[in-house]
A protein has these predicted regions:
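Positively charged, small/polar-rich N-terminal and surface patches that mediate targeting and assembly
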Residues: 1-102
C-alpha cells in the first residue's frame, strides 16, 4: 500500500482531481485536506502559496498509472507527486483496497 501526496492550488481542483482518480479506480480513497501554505523555490525565487494537500491511498501496482494520470490532469507543469510506502495497515482495509482496485 502507498500513500501518494500531491498539492493543488484550490479546493475545487482538489475535489475534481480526487473524484477523477476514484472514478478511474486508481485509488481506494482520496482525502483533500484544508488550505495550507507551501514554501518552495521555483525559477530561482522563493514562493509562498496557498495549497491543498491530497492524500491518495492506493496499491503499489497502481502507482505508475496514477502518476501519469495526475500529471495529465494537474494544473501545475511540475506537480508534486510523492509516494510513501505504508509499512502497516489493518488487514480488513487492505483486503477492501485489493478487492476494489484489483
Amino acid at each position: 500500500m502507498l500513500i501518494v501526496l500531491t498539492t493543488v492550488p484550490s479546493e475545487d481542483e482538489g475535489k475534481a482531481l480526487a473524484e477523477k482518480i476514484i472514478d478511474a479506480r486508481l485509488a481506494a480513497c482520496v482525502q483533500v485536506l484544508p488550505q495550507m501554505t507551501s514554501f518552495y523555490v521555483w525559477e530561482g525565487e522563493t514562493q509562498r502559496e496557498a495549497e491543498h494537500l491530497l492524500l491518495i491511498k492506493t496499491l503499489g501496482s497502481k502507482y505508475d498509472e496514477l502518476e501519469r494520470f495526475i500529471t495529465a490532469n494537474h494544473s501545475y507543469s511540475v506537480p508534486e507527486i510523492v509516494a510513501v510506502d505504508c509499512e502497516r495497515a489493518s488487514n480488513p482495509y487492505l483486503s477492501w483496497m485489493k478487492e476494489l482496485l484489483g
